[in-house]
Amino acid sequence: MTTRSDFDRSLETWLADVRPTSPPGWLLDQTRERLAETDRRSQWLIPDRWTWNANARRVVAGGRIVLVAAVLLLIVLAALAAVVLVGAPRPAPPFGLTTAGYITLDSADGIVVARIDGSDRHVLVPPDGQSISPIWSRDGLHLAFWHRARTVGPWSLVVVGRDGAARHVIAEGVTLREREESLNQPSSITWSPDSQRMAYAADTPAGSAIFVGDIEGGATAITDPKLKGIDPAWAPDGTSIVFVSETSTTLHSVAPDGTGEHQLATLKDIVLWPDWSPDGASLAVSAAVDDQLDVFTVSADGTTVTNVSHDPSAEFSPSWSPDGSRLAWARAPADESARAWVVVSDRAGTRIVELRVPADLAPPVWSPDGTRLYSYVMDDAERFYQLLVLDPEGVAPPVRIQADGNVGNGSWQRLP
């Protein structure tokens, strides 16, 4: 072990080498004092450190208070940041754009994905045959659509991933009704809330039936073809599927495994396109009254049916906003030379805005963030459908999106 006298001698030698003309005595004295202080402190026991000096106790206590205050301040600032970033309302993106996802269309180029302003346009499913009615799963990770190799013949239900890969054939040899092959009809496919299954209507030799398919492949009929089930809509809680029976123009409900089928509500004449409110409390449907299509809401248990449109024009294809506060539907005037409209109302049917658009209107579709609507309109000059973007508040004018060739049914993708 090196002694203090050894250290003194070593320090003297070093100072002599470095500064031979400077007397080292003053530095030796200062160094001895510091070593002595260090030696005294090395003899402290941990419990004794807080009793060695009254001033030290005050300093330590004050330091503790400052530390606690700093921690509390950080917690408060973190909470305020969370409120600002999560809870505060965010400004909507510029009209015609959305950060909520991409719009997906069936077109002459195959199934195309693009931003609503037409940018970042790319082909998700190549035009190898015919692909129609694309619809995104609720988590935005999978796209289902109908496909066939030629322009005639049976269809296959196909699912792909967000990038168009991981292709699964859910069902083959499916015969769709002519109405469901139309450009201006809602998709006949409905996703389960967990995005693992889908329901659809297909013709069988005995009549139309509702089928449920698994995302990995395979499908099973869950309704009696004698009911001629069409237009399935999967409930938000996943426990039931509502569909329309063409046999009796009634709404029916059935569990996804085919059990518990029962009549939910009876409406007059034609019933079409049921759509669940996001909270599962009610459905919106199109139904004919005195040969006139109107929009109705139906309570989840079928006990309350309310006409929310009350208009002499044909009003159809209702669609709930993502937050369930509004309904949008299409209105076709009796006079074919007149313009069509998209109507936006609250849940009670009180009209918020009526958006005038060109004729041959297709069903309106909400963006996932509820800030936009889109529909298809027939271009009078070119005679093919194009995309029309609408502001549901009626403030900004409609924006027509030019498309290459015909466009048909589409879906708005929610980004995961």
Name each model-derived stretch.
Residues 47-52, 172-175:
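Short linear capping/connector segments at secondary-structure termini
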Residues 51-82:
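Internal signal-anchor transmembrane helix that establishes type II topology
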Residues 6, 12-14, 23, 76-416:
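Sequence signature of WD/YWTD-type beta-propeller architectures
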Residues 33-35, 51-54, 93-95, 101:
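N-terminal membrane-targeting/anchoring modules of bacterial envelope and secretion proteins
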